[in-house]
Design a protein with these regions (language model features):
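Residues that scaffold the ATP/ADP-binding catalytic core of kinase and kinase-like folds
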Residues: 154
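...with weaker cross-activation on analogous glycine-rich loops/strands in unrelated enzymes
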Residues: 125-135
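Bacterial N-terminal signal peptides that target proteins for export
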Residues: 1-6
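N-terminal signal peptide c-region/cleavage motif recognized by signal peptidases
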Residues: 12-16
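Generic beta-sheet signal
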Residues: 31-33, 138-146
């Protein structure tokens, strides 16, 4: 049983590394949209007294999350992956990920906030994100810092904290071109 587990582990590691390398190749070329899940946080859900305008009422980046965000930015620079714009959810964990990683103030983009509970509101958020993605035609990359739920709804992919999913429009949805883990 242990041999099987080790063999399985050894098969998975090269796939993850290959996916990351392929993702970096895309990002170096520019012109792509990156859905970046915020870096590691201190908890699992926002408290009952949540206020979008107060970081004290939200879960925030942990010390490891801040290090991870710094690593994200360092790797974008080291891998020569050009960035044209950074859009972010208004949640502090997303804003801080963007600020630390890219050393600039991101553009607030409310549709990247956690998806609302109401189906009509969710659909409106997804439509606004898709409109932004479809309209993007820059030569460098567009980074959109958001949440797990948003990325899953857009792509069907469940990224880890701080993972980047590179996408392009395809039909009514998105096609995942690559992923980069940090």
């Amino acid at each position: 049983m242990i041999r099987f587990a080790l063999a399985l582990f050894m098969l998975v590691i090269p796939v993850a590394a290959h996916a990351t390398d392929a993702g970096w190749a895309l990002l170096r070329d520019g012109g792509h949209v990156v859905l970046l899940r915020h870096a590691m946080v201190t908890g699992t859900s926002d408290p009952a007294n949540f206020d979008i305008d107060s970081c004290a009422t939200q879960i925030n980046l942990s010390a490891r999350g801040k290090q991870q965000a710094s690593k994200i930015g360092a790797l974008f620079a080291a891998r020569a992956a050009p960035i044209e714009r950074v859009l972010s959810s208004r949640y502090c964990r997303c804003l801080d990920t963007a600020r630390i990683a890219f050393e600039a103030e991101p553009e607030l983009f409310a549709p990247l906030d956690l998806l609302k509970g109401d189906d009509a509101q969710k659909a409106a958020q997804i439509a606004a994100i898709m409109k932004e993605i479809r309209a993007y035609s820059g030569s460098d990359n567009l980074v959109m810092v958001t949440h797990l739920e948003d990325i899953v709804a857009l792509t069907g992919v469940s990224p880890r904290e701080g993972e980047a999913v590179i996408v392009e429009p395809q039909g009514d949805g998105l096609r995942v071109l690559g992923r980069v883990t940090f």
